[in-house]
A protein has these predicted regions:
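Surface-exposed loop/turn motifs in large extracellular/passenger domains
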Residues: 21-81, 86-116, 121-157, 161-197, ...
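Gram-negative bacterial Sec-dependent N-terminal signal peptides
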Residues: 1-20
Length: 675
């Protein structure tokens, strides 16, 4: 279903010939002005600059106000739109171009209600138009923003920057070529109720479903910042975005960077129903030349801090969100810098996963999509996360060739807090629902995980490739990293708990040095085939002083049908650790693990070192499972107690070095070298 109701969600639909009268409005024309319940034209539009519509735009109309800055405030009353800059709508004069300019804009809202808050300027079905706005300062401390009765699939309430819209649907507007150029944007929110998505940047919206040469809508802006210190946010589909939006066919956005900061030091809950996204939104596009696109020539970030209560219902995303919904829809996003997430709020409860890179979601009949970022960083100091933590990007695909890549390194640093899902150093590629496609979430550099405190439910050093539902046709999922490094010097590591929709999903392992390939038990054998792959050139795990409550695997982990995990060189070092609990023993595997009809888990070279540690289960110098292979293995044990077996089988060649006082329950297999 095309977004035929989206137009109603963003602005009024009345724009055809039958509605030629100028809309009720108040235009400040650069004069510092305060509006309230006593102001004229209640339910109309408010502009800090000039208002241009239809017949009042002629060949000689002066649209250039670049030397004029604006400053308007709304304290009460009920209006349609509050616009900091200029507004131009469906001009009658169509022979020439329209360069609509304004200087810096400032717009403040302390009370009252509007359906749409726009910090910059707006163009509505205005062809051959360039909308130029200086820097934007937008402040909201109270009031109601958005349409409470909207039935839109994604209502929008507040836009920090500028807004351009058009449709190609016959009789509904003018197919327009419009570009908005906006400077740096700051949107600060300390109160108010928002019945729709909030964007720190600008929005380009083609709300029609008709393909054609036009509309062509573009937003170009500087750095956008969304700062939240209070408020209630009711956008169940989307949420809050530091960046901009490209919505509909041939919509595009370009910026210099974006960020979201949520800081609550009050006693009032900040409740966000929806996602928190540092970058842009891309959705409802077309295919080929009709695809949506986003280019961020800089970095993106999300920070969640403060002593007060903060609640989110959906995922927190450091990069951009590509949400493909239409048949054959395609989309692309690039971030030339890094994406960063910092969570340091003891009273924050995040309802879903944390994704360091960009997130790409597709449906059964959508097309290809790609997202990339140069590097990512996720830091968790305090708070509760009721989902997985992904260092790289994520793909949840059902069709097409879909990728979310990190063209550099990823870093996850956990100093405290609770993660009720798995911590995944690389990317997460997910495919399912009996569809077909090729999904990938790769990291070209090194994925790093550093844990000094807190509690997490599983650690995966590399990426996670995952399939669910029933078999598809020729479907592939890949989550690979160049190298993986895990350093754990404190905290508690429980077994892997993969948080997703449906029944609880766990693996009997706490730490995996490489990647994990995992298909649900609803996936059958080779009819049709499925390929789930993770690769790592080298994996390194160092555990010193932590508490680990389930098995430890130095290599990769392949679980169930179609799964492959490969690591060239796996290194595992354990010292002064507490392994196991009263109810569970812990086994240690130098190599990889393959189980339940997995294709293979392979390690070319494995190194294991255990010092001053008691192992409640067994130690395997090779791997585990019929399809698990290890080339060469070396193990060094110093002052180690192994309650059960020391298993020296599972590798082509094994060397063992004993130092100090060691104790084992039994020995299985034979090493080629003992010292």
């Amino acid at each position: 279903m095309k977004k035929t109701i989206i137009a109603a969600s963003l602005t009024a639909l009345a724009m055809g010939p039958a509605f030629a009268a100028i809309n009720p409005h108040n235009e400040a024309m650069g004069k510092e002005t305060t509006y309230d319940e006593k102001s004229d034209n209640q339910k109309g539009k408010l502009t800090g600059g000039w208002y241009y519509q239809e017949e009042n735009v002629q060949e000689n109309t002066d649209l250039n106000h670049g030397s004029v800055s604006t400053n308007i405030t709304l304290t009460g009353g009920s209006f349609d739109e509050l616009i900091g800059g200029n507004h131009i709508k469906q001009p009658t004069y169509k022979e020439g171009t329209h360069n609509v300019t304004i200087g810096d804009t400032k717009v403040t809202m302390t009370g009252g209600s509007v359906e749409y808050f726009i910090g910059g300027s707006k163009a509505n079905n205005s062809d051959k138009t360039t909308l130029i706005t200086g820097d934007v300062t937008a402040v909201i401390s109270g009031g109601s923003i958005g349409n409470q009765s909207s039935t839109s699939e994604y209502p929008v309430s507040a836009i920090g920057g500028s807004y351009v819209k058009s449709t190609g649907n016959p009789g509904e507007g003018t197919p327009a070529s419009t570009t908005a150029e906006t400077g740096n944007i700051s949107l600060s929110i300390s109160g108010g109720t928002f019945y729709g998505a909030v964007f720190g940047g600008s929005v380009a919206d083609n709300y029609g479903s008709t393909e054609g040469q036009k509309p062509i809508l573009k937003n170009i802006s500087g750095i956008s910042e969304l700062k939240i210190q209070g408020g209630k946010f009711e956008s169940s589909k989307f949420g809050v975005f530091g960046g901009s939006a490209a919505i509909g066919m041939k919509s595009a956005t370009t910026s210099s960077g974006s960020s979201v900061s949520i800081n609550n030091t009050s006693e009032t809950l900040i409740d966000i129903v929806g996602r928190v996204v540092g970058g842009d939104l891309l959705t409802y596009g077309g295919s080929g030349e009709n695809a949506t696109s986003s280019k961020i020539n800089g970095s993106t970030s999300v920070s969640i801090t403060g002593s007060g209560e903060i609640k989110t219902s959906e995922s927190v995303i450091g990069g951009s969100l590509l949400n493909l919904l239409e048949k054959d829809e395609e989309s692309s996003s690039t971030i030339s810098g890094t994406s960063e997430i910092v969570i340091d709020a003891a009273n924050a409860v995040l309802g879903d996963e944390v994704i360091g890179g960009s997130y790409v979601r597709t449906q059964k009949d959508t097309g290809d999509a790609s997202a990339s970022v140069k590097g990512t960083s996720v830091t968790i100091k305090a708070g509760t996360i009721n989902g997985n933590v992904v260092g790289g990007g994520k793909v949840n695909g059902k069709h097409g060739t879909v990728e979310s890549s990190v063209d550099g390194d990823t870093v996850i640093s956990i100093f405290g807090g609770t993660v009720n899902g798995a911590v995944i150093g690389g990317g997460h590629a997910k495919i399912g629902d009996g569809t077909s496609g090729d999904m990938s979430a790769d990291v070209t550099g090194t994925s790093r995980i550093q844990i000094t405190g807190g509690t997490v439910n599983g650690v995966i050093g590399g990426g996670l490739s995952y399939a669910y539902g029933t078999n598809g046709a020729d479907w592939k999922s890949t989550a690979s990293v160049g190298k993986s490094e895990v350093i754990i010097t404190g905290g508690t590591i429980e077994a892997v708990n993969y948080v997703a929709t449906g029944p609880k999903q766990t693996l009997p392992v706490a730490i995996v040095g490489g990647g994990v390939s995992w298909s649900k038990d609803t996936i059958s054998g080779d009819n049709p085939p499925i390929e789930l792959t993770t690769t790592t050139s080298s994996s390194s795990v160092v555990i010193d002083g932590a508490t680990v409550k389930d098995d430890i695997v130095g290599g990769g982990y392949a679980y169930q049908t179609g799964s492959t995990a490969s690591v060239e060189n796996a290194s595992l070092s354990i010292s002064n650790a507490t392994l196991g609990s009263d109810s569970n023993k812990v086994n240690v595997y130098a190599g990889g693990f393959a189980s339940d009809n997995a294709k293979s888990s392979s390690v070319e070279s494995a190194q294991l070192q255990i010092t001053a540690t008691s192992v409640s289960g067994s130690v395997y110098t090779g791997g585990s499972g019929t399809n698990s292979t290890v080339g060469t293995s070396s193990a060094a044990l110093t002052d180690v107690t192994i309650s059960e077996a020391l298993d020296l089988s599972g590798a082509t060649e094994t060397a063992v070095v004993f130092t100090g006082v060691n104790s084992v329950g039994s020995v299985t297999g034979t090493a080629q070298s003992y010292t």
